Amino acid sequence: MKSSLDVNYARINGINIRYIDQNQNREPVLFIHGLGGSIESWNYNIGPMSSRNLRIVALDLPGFGLSDSPKINYSINFYSEYVVKFLQTIGIDRNISIIGSSLGGQIGAEMVIKNNVPVTKLVLISPAGVPPRSFKGTPTLRRYLSILQAKSFEELKNILTSLADGPVKDSYAKIIFERLLRPGAKEAFVSALKESSRALRFTKNIRKSSAKIFVLWGREDKMIPLKFIRPFVRQSNCRILIIEH
């Protein structure tokens, strides 16, 4: 699952991050991955989007992928402010569309609420930050989190295979295994998970946004169940698409 796109590195606020930025001088679209993800999480999406004459931007969030994992609290506030700084660094300060999955959706929503950068469209894919703070996760989510305790590549791949609808490629499992071994990676993972669950739920505040919001959720999503889509149903600025499995 190696990215075929040219990657760049930048040092922002003392943290080295990896990112891609292609088709500059066009309408920008930012991809924000979820917990444990990276640029490669979007491999099957970036290609088709690139052909639509859009500027495609994606980054490894601090603490994930091949970006640095300093010893800090990986709060939603930290991430939203950092991503805005990243966009400013690469020259994006105008209307932008954001596509965020899980944790990435929660970060994108925070950016929209704070309005630090003009966001015209926000696509939320099974976003975190919606279930109540009392939500302790599903068996599937807890199974996913067990990758942190995997002692070998084979054990990690078995965990991923048990969560997937089909076979998991060795190349994909290897990326996750190797990156979890990077200094500070597991600590960053745990911090981001805890901070995500502690953050304010964003569904009420996002109603005030002028951005167009699209919510995608899998009917059989076992990580963050479909029932948590309910707050969006009543929002006039939201369109909802339920994906059949």
Regions flagged by a language model, labelled:
Residues 1-29, 51-54, 85, 92, ...:
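Alpha/beta-hydrolase fold catalytic core
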Residues 12-13, 20, 58-100:
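Active-site loop/oxyanion-hole signature of alpha/beta-hydrolase fold enzymes
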Residues 15-66:
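Conserved HGGG/HGGXW glycine-rich cap/lid loop of the alpha/beta-hydrolase fold
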Residues 100, 104, 108:
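Gly/Ala-rich beta-loop-alpha elbow adjacent to hydrolase catalytic centers
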Residues 109-114, 120-151:
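Flexible "cap/lid" loop of the alpha/beta hydrolase fold
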Residues 135, 151-208:
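Conserved alpha/beta-hydrolase catalytic His-Asp/Glu region
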Residues 209, 215-217, 221:
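Short beta-strand/loop motif that positions the catalytic acidic residue
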Residues 222-228:
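Conserved alpha/beta-hydrolase "acid-adjacent" motif
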